[in-house]
Structures are given as structure tokens and as C-alpha cells.
């Protein structure tokens, strides 16, 4: 199962892609940050985030998208941009018929470190260790996106409409979706040299 994690943000939106194999074996595929410039208008910033997220979903064809659940913060401008970016991630996934799960930061910390109150550096170190990376992913948005993907692999209970989507697909749509997933997996394995 390929899982794309999203740490939503208007200036920096973290994207992490992993593969969850048998026996909870997790493999790193990709990490990046989709950026928008604070010097352009809000609508164009949102478009940049949406286009970046759409490109990642088309490129990696995930089986699930795991997004950080947004909570109200003291800074309304920050929470508004974060909520808008989360909505764009949900929209991009829905347009591709990819199930979405929302996970709180506490859930992700608990899944990764065993401690829901873990510090950011502890989460980053565990993400690095779990995925056998040679160095910690940077910036923090990238590490958080990988943490959300790992969280979903280990604790998929946050899924929204998980099984319903398959029921609404025709047989031809299911075959097409399966073929697209297999093609993407072959390309990813080829890129990895497997």
C-alpha cells in the first residue's frame, strides 16, 4: 500500500510518500515540500499548493492520503491557511478517488514514538530510524508528512469513507484503478533499482 502523508501549510506543505508492505514493513519512497510565495495573492498561493499536491498524487498514485487534522490555534491567519491547504489535499484526493484519513499530531507522535507528547526532534529521529534514512528529512514539514504517512500505516483508524469508495466504482473503474496502481508500483520499483 502506498501512503501519501500531507503536513498542510500555505507557505510550506510537506509531502511524504511511503510504502507499507507485509508485516508492517515500511519503505521510503519520496519526500518534498510544496511551496507558495507569500508575495503573491492568496488565490494564486492556493493554486500553487493544489497543483503541487495534484502532481504528487498523479506521480505516486497512493492508495491512501493521510492529512494532519487542523486544530484552532491562537494565530487565526496561520490556522486559516493550514485549513485551506488541508482542504486542497482532500479535494485533490477525492478527485482521484483516493481515500483520505485525518490524524491529529498527538496520534502521529504516539504511533511514531509511543508518546503522544513527544518533542519534534524525537519524532524526526524515529521517522529517520523507521524508514532507514541516512539523515533526518528537512525541513520539519517534510518529516511531519512522513510521520503522518507512517501513522496511517500503523494506525489506519482515522480513515474517512475508507471502504465506501470501492463500492461506488464500476468494475471497469476498479480494473483501471488497479492497473494504474500496478503501473506506478512498477515505475517506482524501477526507479529504486529493484
Curated annotation (Swiss-Prot):
Reaction(s) catalysed by this chain's protein: Endonucleolytic cleavage at a junction such as a reciprocal single-stranded crossover between two homologous DNA duplexes (Holliday junction)
Q: Which residues bind Mg(2+) 2?
A: 68
Signal peptide stretch:
none
The EC number of this protein is 3.1.21.10
- Which sites are catalytic? 7, 68, 141
Question: What enzyme class is recorded for this protein?
Answer: hydrolase
Q: Where Mg(2+) 1 is bound, by residue?
A: 7, 141
Instruction: Give an example GO molecular function.
Output: magnesium ion binding
Q: How is the cofactor bound?
A: Binds 2 Mg(2+) ion per subunit.
**Keywords linked to the UniProt accession:** Cytoplasm, DNA damage, DNA recombination, DNA repair, DNA-binding, Endonuclease, Hydrolase, Magnesium, Metal-binding, Nuclease
Q: Where in the cell is it found?
A: Cytoplasm
One Pfam entry name: RuvC
Q: How does it assemble?
A: Homodimer which binds Holliday junction (HJ) DNA. The HJ becomes 2-fold symmetrical on binding to RuvC with unstacked arms; it has a different conformation from HJ DNA in complex with RuvA. In the full resolvosome a probable DNA-RuvA(4)-RuvB(12)-RuvC(2) complex forms which resolves the HJ.
Q: Which HAMAP family match?
A: RuvC
Describe the function of this protein: The RuvA-RuvB-RuvC complex processes Holliday junction (HJ) DNA during genetic recombination and DNA repair. Endonuclease that resolves HJ intermediates. Cleaves cruciform DNA by making single-stranded nicks across the HJ at symmetrical positions within the homologous arms, yielding a 5'-phosphate and a 3'-hydroxyl group; requires a central core of homology in the junction. The consensus cleavage sequence is 5'-(A/T)TT(C/G)-3'. Cleavage occurs on the 3'-side of the TT dinucleotide at the point of strand exchange.
Q: What is this protein called?
A: Crossover junction endodeoxyribonuclease RuvC
Species the sequence originates in: Bifidobacterium longum (strain NCC 2705)
Question: What's the source species' lineage?
Answer: Bacteria, Bacillati, Actinomycetota, Actinomycetes, Bifidobacteriales
Amino acid at each position: 500500500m502506498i501512503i501519501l502523508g500531507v503536513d498542510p501549510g500555505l507557505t510550506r506543505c510537506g509531502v511524504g510518500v511511503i510504502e507499507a508492505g507485509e508485516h508492517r514493513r515500511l519503505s521510503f519512497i519520496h519526500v518534498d515540500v510544496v511551496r507558495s510565495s507569500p508575495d503573491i495573492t492568496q488565490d494564486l498561493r492556493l493554486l500553487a499548493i493544489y497543483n503541487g499536491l495534484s502532481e504528487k498524487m498523479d506521480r505516486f498514485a497512493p492508495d491512501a492520503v493521510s492529512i494532519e487534522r487542523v486544530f484552532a490555534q491562537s494565530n487565526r491567519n496561520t490556522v486559516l491557511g493550514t485549513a485551506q491547504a488541508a482542504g486542497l489535499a482532500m479535494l485533490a484526493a477525492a478527485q482521484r478517488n483516493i481515500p483520505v484519513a485525518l490524524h491529529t499530531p498527538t496520534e502521529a507522535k504516539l504511533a511514531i514514538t509511543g508518546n503522544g507528547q513527544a518533542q519534534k526532534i524525537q519524532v524526526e529521529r524515529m521517522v529517520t530510524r523507521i524508514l532507514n534514512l541516512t539523515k533526518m528529512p528537512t525541513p520539519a514539514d517534510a518529516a511531519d508528512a512522513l510521520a503522518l504517512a507512517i501513522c496511517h500505516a500503523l494506525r489506519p483508524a482515522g480513515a474517512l469513507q475508507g471502504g465506501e469508495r470501492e463500492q461506488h466504482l464500476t468494475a471497469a473503474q476498479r480494473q483501471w484503478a488497479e492497473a494504474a496502481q500496478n503501473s506506478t508500483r512498477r515505475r517506482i520499483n524501477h526507479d529504486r533499482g529493484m
